[in-house]
Amino acid sequence: MGLRSCTHLATLFMTLWALAFCFLVVVPIPAQTTSLQNAKDDRRLQELESKIGAESDQPNANLVGPSFSRFGDRRNQKTISFGRRVPLISRPMIPIELDLLMDNDDERTKAKRFDDYGHMRFGKRGGDDQFDDYGHMRFGR
């Protein structure tokens, strides 16, 4: 009888634990529901703005009223949490003044990478006696 009561308690505990887990997962938290409601409101405002924009292109649209002034103001519709998606001005990583002062070896390394025929060389370029013009290693010299 003792073993049966332990198994009954274990199954009861497991079912209660599963119900509690489902309750925590399924039932929404009030903070999440308010943020979801705010997101839905923002989306609804954007849809209304796009509809109003489409109607303003039509010549017979009557948009005089308080709804146009409320939805037409773009300052009220900006989301603060998101930053700029694209930078306004694309600038180089190194300022122009500093780039003129720096010694760039790009021209010298490009000359080393290609042979007289325009083919790219492979391998180390340490010494001319070690490799030929095509990047093949010389043996026996």
Curated annotation (Swiss-Prot):
Drosulfakinin-0 (DSK 0) plays diverse biological roles including regulating gut muscle contraction in adults but not in larvae. GO terms for cellular component: extracellular region. Residues 34-73, 86-111 form a propeptide. The gene is Dsk. Residues 51-72 are annotated as: Disordered. The modification Phenylalanine amide is found at residues 82, 122, 139. PROSITE patterns: GASTRIN (PS00259). This is Drosulfakinins. The modification Sulfotyrosine is found at residues 117, 134. It is found in: Secreted. The keyword Ion transport does not apply. Pfam families: Sulfakinin. One of its GO terms (molecular function) is neuropeptide receptor binding.
